[in-house]
Amino acid sequence: MSNTTQALSRIEAILDDSSFVEIGAGVTARSTDFNIQEKKAPSDGVITGYGVINGNLVYVYSQDATVLNGSIGEMHAKKISALYDYAMKMGAPVIGLIDCAGLRLQEATDALEGFGTIYKKMSIASGVIPQITAVYGNCGGGLAILSSLSDFTFMEDSKAKLFVNSPNALDGNNESKLDSASAKFQAEAGVVDFTGDEETIANGVRQLVSMLPANNEEDAAVSATTDDLNRACPDMAAEIADPALALSDIADDNVFVEVKASYAKEMVTGFIQVDGITIGAVANRKALYDEEGEVAEKFEPVLTVKGAYKAENFVNFCNAFEIPVLTLTNVKGFEATVAAEKGIAIASAKLTYAFANADVPKVNVITGEAYGSAYVSMNSKSLGADLVYAWPTASIGMMDSQLAAKIMYADEIAAASDVAATVSEKAAEYAKLQSSVESAAARGYVDAVIDPENTRQYVAAAFEMLFSKREVRPDKKHGTV
């Protein structure tokens, strides 16, 4: 066993007590450049092994910054690659704890080849076993690619640095003005999923592993709960502007684990459990509340480029690991800016494809506006949602009724003596005929109109019914969207 180091302490903080078993403790560096003096390198700067989290097998590696600054050399890379081989054989998650100075210069291309080997192992493991990375120190250059190949990335928020190019190497950037390697910057860029101190990271990794399946052939994790499935949610309608609150209300014991909370805040993604079963949640956000319950930020209920990519990536993960998906839909269109126009079509296409391609149980609850193609892209019935519910106050249709009235009754409105009253009258007629939940239900696009306070009850019943869902799809290697 390696000496007690910070690297080992980080492993022990994540795993169940006394469960860690080290593999490859005797491995040491094999210097491949005879022009540089060889140094002692216990475990070649990385501790590898296995243990359990709440009784579930996981494989862990932790880089030791006290040994050659935790740099990656040939044997260091081989140890991580071998750990992936074990994990793939056993169908168990891999957790990587990063604190690394980068490539080991004295091993030159041998170290570089080691990087490539790890990249390949991670790529093959993607969608087969969950991969989680926690950045505690430096994670620069090629290490940033490694962390981004994982499914979820945690980052220590005071000392850790994550970058492809260091801040002072960026054209026009002054590090004192913009620390592009900081946890805050990378979280807002969507590179990092969770930030916090080391204790928060350890607890977060444990919680996440406990909610996820061990591999793509295992059913979603099931946890014991005493929370009443028929529990009413009287505050649901008031909370829906910030779906993070609404999802907490739906969840067992009010636990919602939000993913990428600092990125594309107008789109909420994360995990809840209902009746102990893990469910991936995607929702449109109109407001973000602070700890005092005051509105901190407001958002238009539209699909944005970043929001679409965020949701697409999350839905793809859920589909890969057979995790059911719940959507809370409140979207009236697409972001309408010149900058957005450069990417919104592709981003929305990817989101649409992700929902349509996902063959896991899918439930959609329409909580507000649901207009046009943006609504269709948000897990609509036509895309394959198994069950669609709507609140009585929801609106479902081509567009906002006021705008529709102005287009459809343009001549009549122009000739009216009271334009505003005529627009309101025609808008009400259009809404009743084309945009009401009753109209959508009559056409089969909504399965039931439900009261907001009964949302948990209906969601629980829906996923229980859909538990054994199976779909037959055409044989293909993969899609190209």
Feature locations, PLM:
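Ligand-binding clefts of soluble mixed alpha/beta catalytic domains
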Residues: 1-481
